[in-house]
From Swiss-Prot:
It holds the Pfam family Aminotran_1_2. It catalyses: S-adenosyl-L-methionine = 1-aminocyclopropane-1-carboxylate + S-methyl-5'-thioadenosine + H(+). Its cofactor is pyridoxal 5'-phosphate. It comes from Arabidopsis thaliana. Ubiquitinated by XBAT32. Ubiquitination probably leads to its subsequent degradation, thus controlling ethylene production. Belongs to the class-I pyridoxal-phosphate-dependent aminotransferase family. The modification N6-(pyridoxal phosphate)lysine is found at residue 285. Keywords: Ethylene biosynthesis, Fruit ripening, Lyase, Pyridoxal phosphate, S-adenosyl-L-methionine, Ubl conjugation. Homodimer and heterodimer. In vivo, the relevance of heterodimerization with other ACS enzymes is however unsure. Interacts with XBAT32. Pathway: Alkene biosynthesis; ethylene biosynthesis via S-adenosyl-L-methionine; ethylene from S-adenosyl-L-methionine: step 1/2. This is 1-aminocyclopropane-1-carboxylate synthase 7. Its EC number is 4.4.1.14. Induction: By cycloheximide (CHX). One of its GO terms (molecular function) is 1-aminocyclopropane-1-carboxylate synthase activity.
Amino acid sequence: MGLPLMMERSSNNNNVELSRVAVSDTHGEDSPYFAGWKAYDENPYDESHNPSGVIQMGLAENQVSFDLLETYLEKKNPEGSMWGSKGAPGFRENALFQDYHGLKTFRQAMASFMEQIRGGKARFDPDRIVLTAGATAANELLTFILADPNDALLVPTPYYPGFDRDLRWRTGVKIVPIHCDSSNHFQITPEALESAYQTARDANIRVRGVLITNPSNPLGATVQKKVLEDLLDFCVRKNIHLVSDEIYSGSVFHASEFTSVAEIVENIDDVSVKERVHIVYSLSKDLGLPGFRVGTIYSYNDNVVRTARRMSSFTLVSSQTQHMLASMLSDEEFTEKYIRINRERLRRRYDTIVEGLKKAGIECLKGNAGLFCWMNLGFLLEKKTKDGELQLWDVILKELNLNISPGSSCHCSEVGWFRVCFANMSENTLEIALKRIHEFMDRRRRF
């Protein structure tokens, strides 16, 4: 069935029609989150050529361990590994059609890597892995499978601004926020869950699931095991799904501080409970490979796996990419070294920015994971409102030339919080960013 058509607003009545999806404003790209990216693109910082330019601190990209990947590829001769087998047979193997849901060798390697990240505390069946072109595609595909247009997913705030696009735009599904606050470090409570569910019911919106990020983006903190258990109990009582986006699971500074929902499921025998749980993963954050566009859906539900395989034809990963990464992820000596060093480098980088901000008189939420910190500038707001927050964000963007993400773009229930990324730049660039913040705070104190 085709999409219903409507006229695009224009003074020209003869304009050709576009679909409702095309002219919808649910793409989310009018958010300050994306406006900051545009400001960076127009005036990017460069240490030599544009030292006064905008420093991009709104992009959660992991560049701190790229040297490890480059060294591995140089030593392992990627020409052979990326083609599977060498020469003409390898080329033929890549050039012809493959299983839409992913090459078996790569799914096996991905399953092993996901187990390794979790310290062997959860097992993953390669036959339950469906490959997608990144986590963005995985989350959207799952939303298509779990919900109908005008249904809703409950999502705890603050949440990743891109979810407004990924979960809503093409699917027609709504996001109903689970409002969390700083009184308990923004952890999800049973009361907040029930309140969000009731809000949806009062609006005659059918709730189809809860979607969380663990570790949280933008908080940079893991979800506690008890909270995960409460979430699953809630989903069972309401007969809805639980989606856990775990794309930062390998970026927890200390592995023991992370509990995957897979560990909870591991100890459950009841199939009717297990089959409502779905995990999203990607190599974009932990391995720092967003350009490779590799994401996965892992579901304990046979029907979801079956449908995701069918839908994955719209979001394939190239065979060449799969062959190369299968070779890399199957090298356990390399992956163990990479995970260990990457965790330590991220922890040191986090400590650098948090201590630097503290010296400037700025506090952050205590974090233990991810590529960002959650910074509290509420004390600088002239007005304790969303407009007041955006005014401060505008000053930071235009006067300090720093692009950070305001909490309102993450639907935070409290004003004055900002997400600040630290892993997509050199240590020297981070020091320059901190210097700009220190100078800004000094000026504020004088006036």
